[in-house]
């Protein structure tokens, strides 16, 4: 029997706190309820939006796209805006859970890079349902005093028994499957049941070597020297490298993927005018800069990039140029089904 990967047990350990309320949120006509990754927006941005518009913002947080889908599907909270990964945006579009965004009245949407908007057509073909927020790659953050550059040139190092109890993996099904699929020579978006099970077998074999499955804690753990390497998003790697000069980042030769986190308006949105006003606000140069400085991931906001120094712009950990990632930005449709029951 086939189940969604988010129901899989035995491969990933759950971790972290639940930052959302378990009670149904009472809708205030003057309040936007937003669901976003943890630590993924500068809260001063929310304060400034409230001050300028008089519209209140209630922020709910989650750790993984699978957790987001569970929260969203429960229906106990009527969200007005959600930020999540590209493949989950596509899933919800296909499930007819998403409203069209009217960009015609946006004043600052023009600040967004047209190439990133075009890349978003992989999961939002007409760019009608989503707005890009940040983008980046998935790779290996490693401590150069423990691991050589040559070793991290391949995903195979994540299965090296010499690093038992010193490997951090992502507590996200999609991301954990990426290295296993690439190492096996498979497309990261495969829907082939046998290929997915091959990757699952690799992850099960890897589990005894893993120090922990994290999301938000990875950068800090690596900065403190608690592990030799970690599967991370590029922005998290850049953050950790600022804290520890011994850290470096690599996209293995087998390739990875370029991801685009995006905002969408669910059908539970009670005031599309306010929601669209908030999205346009995020596109402003000053607001985009606040968010970039806080999150430190690649921003699609060209007005922000014009004000960054050359050292930052040329840092490929932040702004990826590796074609091995860009060429893997392909459709994720229905790539989350496997045989369950293995552990």
Which residues fall in each region the model found?
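C-terminal motif of bacterial Sec signal peptides marking the signal peptidase cleavage site
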Residues: 10-14
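Bacterial signal peptide processing site
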Residues: 16-18
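Early extracytoplasmic/lumenal segment of secretory-pathway proteins
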Residues: 23-91
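Extracytoplasmic ligand-binding site segments that recognize negatively charged/polar headgroups
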Residues: 40, 78-79, 83-226
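A ligand-binding cleft/hinge motif common to bilobed small-molecule-binding domains
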Residues: 88-91, 223, 229-246
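A bilobed periplasmic-binding-protein/Venus flytrap-type ligand-binding module shared by bacterial periplasmic
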Residues: 139-146, 182-183, 259-271, 281-282, ...
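Periplasmic-binding protein-like
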Residues: 196-205, 211, 243-267
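Mature extracytoplasmic/periplasmic domains
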Residues: 266-326
């Amino acid at each position: 029997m086939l189940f969604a990967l988010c129901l899989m047990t035995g491969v990933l350990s759950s971790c972290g706190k639940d930052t959302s309320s378990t009670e149904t949120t009472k809708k205030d006509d003057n309040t936007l309820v937003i669901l976003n990754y943890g630590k993924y927006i500068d809260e001063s941005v929310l304060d400034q939006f409230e001050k300028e518009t008089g519209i209140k913002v209630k922020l709910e947080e989650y750790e993984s796209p699978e957790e987001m889908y569970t929260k969203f599907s429960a229906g106990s909270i009527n969200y007005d805006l959600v930020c999540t990964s590209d493949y989950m945006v596509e899933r919800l579009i296909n499930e007819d859970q998403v409203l069209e965004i009217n960009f015609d009245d946006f004043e600052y949407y023009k600040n967004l890079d047209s190439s990133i908007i075009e890349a978003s057509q992989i999961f939002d073909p007409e760019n009608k349902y989503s707005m890009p927020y940040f983008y980046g790659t998935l790779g290996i953050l490693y401590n150069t005093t423990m691991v050589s550059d040559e070793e991290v040139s391949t995903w195979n190092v994540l299965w090296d028994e010499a690093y038992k109890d010193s490997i951090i993996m992502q507590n996200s099904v999609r991301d954990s499957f990426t290295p296993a699929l690439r190492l096996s020579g498979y497309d990261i978006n495969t829907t082939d049941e046998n290929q997915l099970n091959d990757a699952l077998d690799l992850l099960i074999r890897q589990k005894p070597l893993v120090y922990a499955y994290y999301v938000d804690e990875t950068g800090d753990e690596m900065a403190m020297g608690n592990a030799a390497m970690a599967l991370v998003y590029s922005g998290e790697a850049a953050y950790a490298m600022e804290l520890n000069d011994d850290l470096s980042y690599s996209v293995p030769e087998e390739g990875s993927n370029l991801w685009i986190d995006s905002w969408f308006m669910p059908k539970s949105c009670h005031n599309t005018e306010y929601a669209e006003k908030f999205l346009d606000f995020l596109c402003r140069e000053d607001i985009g800069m606040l968010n970039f400085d806080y999150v430190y991931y690649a921003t699609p906001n060209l007005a922000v990039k014009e004000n960054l120094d050359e050292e930052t712009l040329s840092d490929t950990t932040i702004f990826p140029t590796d074609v091995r990632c860009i060429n893997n930005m392909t459709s994720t449709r229905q790539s989350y089904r496997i045989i369950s029951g293995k552990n």
